[in-house]
Amino acid sequence: MATMSNDAAAAATWHNNTSTPMDTTEPATNSHNPGETAVIGGPEALLLPSGSGPEEMNRHPLLMAQAHGEHHQPRLLHNFPVIPPPIQQHQQPPLLQQAQPSQIPHPTQPQIDPTMFTQQSGFNWPPIDPNTIAALAQAQLASSHAQFVSLALTLDPTLLSHFLATQQIPPVPQPLVHKKAEMELRVGNRFRLGRKIGSGSFGDIYLGQNIQTNEEVAVKLECVKSKHPQLHIESRLYRIMLGGIGIPEIRWCGQEGDYNVMVMELLGPSLEDLFNFCQRKFSLKTVLLLADQMLSRVEFIHCRDYIHRDIKPDNFLMGLGKRGNLVYIIDFGLAKRYRDSKHQHIAYRENKNLTGTARYASINTHRGIEQSRRDDIESLGYVFMYFNRGTLPWQGLKAVTKRQKYELISEKKISTRVDDLCAGYPEAFAQYLNYCRSLGFEEQPDYGYLRNLFRTLFHRQQFCYDYVFDWNTYKFYNESLEARNNFQQAVPNQRRH
């Protein structure tokens, strides 16, 4: 047998430095198929450019770290397929990526030692002739390394068998020949997890699908290691509110791995989203249509002995399909019971931290007073004026800390007279806020009186209860306006004689 050169010895040394398998089981999204989830595997030492010799390989940061006994978590690189972990017996293999024809090495090209891949992958290959290994060691200096890696990364059994056949290596064991297996994340055994669509008070919300009925759902996840887990409390409140108009239904709740999971009815965009869509300005008709439904949702929560404590446009969503005109209320992560089963009201307390969203919080909440029904109602009033005005006077205040910003908002809110806040808008809005601020801590709001303020205004304006909101007509208005402008540019006005 011929003696190996120094470069060949260096290449063999490189094999020894990279032969230790890495722990690679971190999930990631496959860039070639965004809807699929794959498992990253294999060392970054394989991701070397074409023409890399021993010197370039030894300069690779991961190889240098491995030489010193360090291990790094691999990362998915753009446009690189992924290497599945070793396939155990009776284990369904992960999704494989098809190799391109250009990735098949030519039989006459020198190839890298397949034992490197054997060591990295954990596959049990049949014994290889030592003479063949020695001969292949010389080929490690060739520029065909990237070609081998390009093929090996795909791990397509048919193509890999073709490659090994060019080296007179026994074919791939039959258990590795298989069809593609779809990879996906599921919760509750029947809900497929998709992309992230939002965030709540204590968790992220993802789009999901019931694989049995094809119904799309919303999936809320919360880490079980959260300092103050709230999702199980929120799911219980949804069940307490079950049956109310504008209350989303729960499909499933439980724990999956390190996450608490709640699967619920999928809803449409939030009022904040629609407000932005309409250039941050709602017409009076839309505000009154929304106010009527939003008041009813809050009243229903109160009649079930709870207060919401986080009233804001983001927590009111429109329905989908036939319920597209129905306003829903969501996110009970901060909700609190204000009276017990005997209708005993909670005690009045002070020096409470602010709970909720400062922009819409009541004045008493800013003052540290325990919240009750009056505070939810007052917060609604600020939301209505936000829709009318586009902004509130206490928005955009700058401060170094969050506490300082809350203090600035509180000072500005207290110093702003209701008449000034509602100047230029129908008197019903000022009457609404003045009534809310006059309520006692345990006093029950007169929801009917408040609704009639806006219904009377609605009829006085001769609006129609057709449930046509601004966002229903905004798109068509823009399209017609654009068409008219294009027509005027194409057909200029001509002087008449």
From Swiss-Prot:
Expressed throughout larval development and into the adult stage in both hypodermal seam cells and the hermaphrodite specific neuron. Residues 88-105 have a biased composition (Low complexity). Residues 1-58, 86-109 are annotated as: Disordered. It comes from the Eukaryota. GO terms for molecular function: ATP binding; protein serine kinase activity; protein serine/threonine kinase activity. PROSITE patterns: PROTEIN_KINASE_ATP (PS00107), PROTEIN_KINASE_DOM (PS50011), PROTEIN_KINASE_ST (PS00108). GO terms for biological process: endocytosis; positive regulation of canonical Wnt signaling pathway; positive regulation of proteasomal ubiquitin-dependent protein catabolic process; regulation of collateral sprouting; regulation of locomotion; rhythmic process; signal transduction. GO terms for cellular component: adherens junction; chromosome, centromeric region; cytoplasm; nucleus. Disruption phenotype: RNAi-mediated knockdown results in precocious seam cell fusion and the early exit of seam cell from the cell cycle during the L4 larval stage. RNAi-mediated knockdown does not impair alae formation. RNAi-mediated knockdown results in a squat body statue, referred to as a dumpy phenotype, and rescues the incomplete alae formation defect in the lin-42 (n1089) mutant. RNAi-mediated knockdown increases the survival rate and partially restores alae formation of let-7 n2853 mutants at 20 dgrees Celsius. InterPro entries: CK1_Ser-Thr_kinase (IPR050235), Kinase-like_dom_sf (IPR011009), Prot_kinase_dom (IPR000719), Protein_kinase_ATP_BS (IPR017441), Ser/Thr_kinase_AS (IPR008271). It catalyses: L-seryl-[protein] + ATP = O-phospho-L-seryl-[protein] + ADP + H(+); L-threonyl-[protein] + ATP = O-phospho-L-threonyl-[protein] + ADP + H(+). Residues 14-34 have a biased composition (Polar residues). Keywords: ATP-binding, Biological rhythms, Cell junction, Centromere, Chromosome, Cytoplasm, Developmental protein, Kinase, Nucleotide-binding, Nucleus, Phosphoprotein, Serine/threonine-protein kinase, Transferase. Exhibits substrate-dependent heparin activation. Essential serine/threonine-protein kinase that regulates diverse cellular growth and survival processes including Wnt signaling, DNA repair and circadian rhythms. Casein kinases are operationally defined by their preferential utilization of acidic proteins. Positively regulates the expression of components of the heterochronic pathway, which regulate developmental timing, such as the transcriptional repressor lin-42 and microRNAs such as let-7. Negatively regulates cell cycle exit and cell fusion to prevent the premature differentiation of hypodermal seam cells into adult cells. This is Casein kinase I isoform delta. The gene is kin-20.
